[in-house]
Structure formats: structure tokens, C-alpha cells
Amino acid sequence: LNAISNFFVPNQRIISVEDTRELVLPKILHWVPLETRLPNPEGKGGIQMLDLIVNSLRMRPDRIVVGEIRRKMEAEVLFEAMHTGHSVYGTLHANNAKETINRLTNPPIDLPKQILSALSLIVVQHINRRTVKRRTLQIAEVLPNGDARILMQLNPIKDTFEIVNE
């Protein structure tokens, strides 16, 4: 998400929502970082990711950036934001585009496949722990039926990114 933020217009209002603050957006002039908080020993004062996502919609964002989608309610609110016209960026742990769709449409997130058409692209990245290099493995578009169609994919033998479908 840090890398893609270089393509954001600097004067846009960006709201980021994270469990642990990892994003750094120095070029963004109007960045509002929101971070979850654990409750105190009495069990009060905790701030959940869902609360922050819901509140971010009230802050008139140009873009919403969510560190990681883990729960059904978070995903539902994000997709609702997408369907109402907000630009939303988020991460999810998956090994490829098809697995991303499966993670979103099966428990614990369990969204209906039809609403996935709100997604434009799925970008799958991987960090090679041996070489400590980050690589984009796949770029896929989400079709109206909710399936992913691979557009570009890494050729690991040539270490090049190749067009699969146009």
C-alpha cells in the first residue's frame, strides 16, 4: 500500500485504517491515519477496526486505505463503501487471485460473490525471504460474476512480468 500511494494525488483526503500503523504517506497533504486500540485493563476504551472503517466514511475521504481485512463485518462495510462510490484499497493474505476470491467468499468473511464486482483489480505480491525481494505475482480483474481473470503474471523462470489476457 505504501508503493501504490505514490500514485495518489497529494492534495486528496486519504483516510488509513490499520491495526498497527505501518503506512507512511509523506507526500499526502491531507492524510488521516486511524489505528485500533486495545481496551484498558477494565475492558474499556478499545477501538475496533470496524468502528474506524465506519467512522472513516463520515470523514469525507477521497480514498480509504485499510491495512488488512480479517473479518466479515469489516469486509461488508468496505464493499458498501465501494458500492457508494468511495475509492477503497485494502490488503488480504492470499497466494493468488483465485485464492483471494475464495477467502472473500468463504468463512470467516463469507461475502456473496455478486458483490465482488465492486473490486476492479486484485494485485498479488510476494516477498521472497531468501532474496528479500518483493515481486508482483499476478494482476487480475474481477469479472461481473465475481470470478478473477488473470491479466498479467510473473514468469518465475525469466523473472519477467508477462501479459496473460488482454
Regions found by a protein language model. Name each.
Residues 3-114, 118-128:
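Switch/coupling sub-region of P-loop NTPases
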Residues 121-166:
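Conserved P-loop NTPase
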